């Protein structure tokens, strides 16, 4: 593993991806003069990432205010690599214009497809044949920067939001390991993103069909909708809804059943909204 040319490396992220990258870079920085720091935006103070940083004596800061995080990044004055790993903070123009600051970002789609948030949800709902991950440089356009490396995942009817997310995070770390040496030297082969009419910017509030199952869809589309919002026991997305006889219900669970006219058996709950 090559030593880093950077004075500092800041990992800004959440969850297992940020944690695994931090563990790897702790080894890299131990053999160099590079300072490793970690931070999170809107992360639980009791997360595995924050807990590991504290027990490993890696400087860690948790932010819940955009201005405070911007001030923190602005305090860096020497060559710095910022790794945005499963991070929801959008970097403002003054930060992007700093010549000594290099920023890369993990995104959970094959850019330029599905820019923005919950890309895995949209990839499943739109019945893409493949999904994947992209490591890219950060530019002024959201998820529009030059591509460092992409890895694909072939999709089939078994993929749910949760399953795809888990595979993407592991693939994202594997891809990071591939580029780590080049990244430490900032010696990357970059590819400009192709312009695509299919490139849509998804926002956090956006849900397929506003989160309501359309009973007129065919079985495959219904399945894609349900799987795209299936987060298991987590609460990463709101539960999908269904309208039966003019009344809206929350879909708590679903099971394929070809004997049911709807194609599925549902466990339903009262819907308050």
Q: What kind of feature is each model-predicted range?
A:
Residues 1-237, 242-249, 253-272:
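One-carbon transfer enzymes
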